[in-house]
Each structure stands twice: as structure tokens, then as C-alpha cells.
């Protein structure tokens, strides 16, 4: 069921020019959806840099509120999709796969495949700094488009759109074993939750050179996890990343 918010968009935004309306029509063809109110899609493509803080002090005109909503819709649809598609996978495995499926890398790739980058509205400074090609901006715009579609046409329409984007990507993610690479998975989680990268520290090295063992801690945000251990720094880092990921994601087993 649509939330019928077209009047809100029309009150808070200037009318679309004929050129912009035609541009959005072409994008909708690429997306495979049709908006009742194209101003919703226009707002989803409007980056914060387009407006001064005075112009948009309530966040009504740029896309960040839609991004917030789209992130929630995307997460729910992705979780249900994986639950049905992977009936033999346990909760931790599903969570790892989902983290990659809705990551900034995946969403920015989706944005490029749909040519969303061609339709973004950016401020002059952001445009000059290469914002049209920044993964975070592309991923955020993808989530905002999902949120706009939910507002304009309802959950079912948004769900169909998201499933069309995600389903073809589930198998490649599984086949590449990205969900078993705990360092990559932890990096995704750290970026999404803390906007930072995990930092690994060798805290101890034991044994002779021919049989050495490394002990590694990892710091994510302000929290420290570990130690993980292994016969190489790489394997010890993977072990520490697994410990951190399981605790941060709430999948630590007794």
C-alpha cells in the first residue's frame, strides 16, 4: 500500500523542469519501476551538498532521510531473501552473507549497473571532488531510491525491486567464499557501524622460528578483541577478526 506522500514532495521541492522529468523517465525505464510521483525519485538522487544548511536545515530536500528508510527496507528484504534461499545455513552464516550483500561495495556496483551515477544531483564542490564516483555516495543513493520507491508505491513494489537486484548476487557471493573471509566481513561491519577500519596488533609471538605462533588483537572503534592466534600473522588476524565479528554481530556461541 502506498503511503501517498506525493503532496509532501510537491510542497517541499520546486517543480521538475521538463528536462529533468524526461531524465527521470529514462532512469525509471532502466530501474524497471514507475513512480507515481517522480519528485520522490528526484529527491532520492539529491545529495546533501546540493543545499546549504540554511536551505535544508530539517533535511527535507536532500536524500538522507530516504536513505535511512531504504536501508531498513533493504535489510528486511535481504534477510528474508537469504532465509528462504539458504535453508541449510545457520544464523551466523546468513548474517555474514547479508553483510556482504548489502555492503557499500555491492550497493555502489548496483548503482553503476543502473547508471544512477548519471542522474545524481550534487553540489559544485562535491562534483569537483569526484563525488559522482564515490562508493559511499553511490551506495547511499541506491538505498535512497529504495526508500523513495517504498514511500511512493509501497512495500511490495520496493521488495520486488530489491529482490531483482539481490537474487542474482547471492550465488556469486557464496561461491567466492566472501562470507568466510572474516577480515573482509569485519571491515564491512566496521565501516557500516563506526565508519572506520579494524586495526590489527601483534601482541605476542611464541615458539622457535620453525614453529612460531602469533597472537593478534584487533581494535574496532573503541573496543579491542582477541587475541586470535595462528602459525602466521595472516591466520592470527583472521582468527582475531572472527572473534570480533562474532561478538559485534551477536552470534557468539556458548
UniProtKB/Swiss-Prot annotation:
Its cofactor is Mg(2+). Its EC number is 3.1.26.3. It is found in: Cytoplasm. Signal peptide: none annotated. Mg(2+) binds at residues 67, 140, 143. Digests double-stranded RNA. Involved in the processing of primary rRNA transcript to yield the immediate precursors to the large and small rRNAs (23S and 16S). Processes some mRNAs, and tRNAs when they are encoded in the rRNA operon. Processes pre-crRNA and tracrRNA of type II CRISPR loci if present in the organism. Residues 181-250 form the DRBM domain. InterPro entries: dsRBD_dom (IPR014720), RNase_III (IPR011907), RNase_III_dom (IPR000999), RNase_III_sf (IPR036389). The gene is rnc. Residues 24-154 form the RNase III domain. One of its GO terms (molecular function) is ribonuclease III activity. Homodimer. GO terms for biological process: mRNA processing; regulation of gene expression; rRNA processing; tRNA processing. The active site is at residues 71, 143. It is an enzyme of class 3 (hydrolase). Keywords: Cytoplasm, Endonuclease, Hydrolase, Magnesium, Metal-binding, mRNA processing, Nuclease, RNA-binding, rRNA processing, rRNA-binding, tRNA processing. This is Ribonuclease 3. One of its GO terms (cellular component) is cytoplasm. Pfam families: dsrm, Ribonucleas_3_3. The lineage of its organism: Bacteria, Pseudomonadati, Spirochaetota, Spirochaetia, Spirochaetales. It catalyses: Endonucleolytic cleavage to 5'-phosphomonoester.
Amino acid at each position: 500500500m502506498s503511503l501517498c506522500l506525493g503532496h509532501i514532495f510537491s510542497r517541499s521541492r520546486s517543480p521538475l523542469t521538463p528536462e529533468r522529468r524526461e531524465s527521470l523517465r529514462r532512469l525509471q525505464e532502466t530501474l524497471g519501476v514507475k513512480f507515481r510521483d517522480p519528485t520522490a525519485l528526484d529527491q532520492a538522487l539529491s545529495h546533501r551538498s546540493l543545499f546549504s544548511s540554511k536551505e535544508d536545515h530539517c533535511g527535507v530536500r536532500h536524500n538522507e532521510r530516504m536513505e535511512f528508510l531504504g536501508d531498513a527496507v533493504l535489510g528486511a528484504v535481504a534477510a528474508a531473501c537469504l532465509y528462504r534461499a539458504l535453508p541449510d545455513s545457520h544464523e551466523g552464516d546468513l548474517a555474514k552473507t547479508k553483510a556482504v550483500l548489502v555492503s557499500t561495495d555491492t550497493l555502489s556496483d548496483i548503482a553503476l549497473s543502473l547508471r544512477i551515477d548519471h542522474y545524481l544531483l550534487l553540489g559544485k564542490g562535491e562534483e569537483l571532488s569526484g563525488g559522482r564516483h564515490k562508493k559511499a555516495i553511490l551506495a547511499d543513493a541506491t538505498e535512497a531510491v529504495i526508500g523513495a520507491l517504498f514511500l511512493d508505491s509501497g512495500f511490495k513494489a520496493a521488495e520486488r525491486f530489491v529482490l531483482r537486484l539481490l537474487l542474482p548476487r547471492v550465488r556469486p557471493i557464496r561461491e567466492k567464499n566472501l562470507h568466510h573471509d572474516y577480515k573482509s566481513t569485519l571491515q564491512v561491519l566496521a565501516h557500516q557501524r563506526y565508519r572506520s577500519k579494524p586495526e590489527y596488533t601483534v601482541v605476542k609471538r611464541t615458539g622457535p622460528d620453525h614453529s612460531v605462533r602469533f597472537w593478534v588483537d584487533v581494535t574496532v572503534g573503541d573496543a579491542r578483541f582477541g587475541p586470535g592466534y595462528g602459525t602466521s600473522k595472516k591466520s592470527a588476524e583472521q582468527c582475531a577478526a572472527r572473534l570480533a565479528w562474532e561478538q559485534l554481530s551477536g552470534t557468539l556461541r556458548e
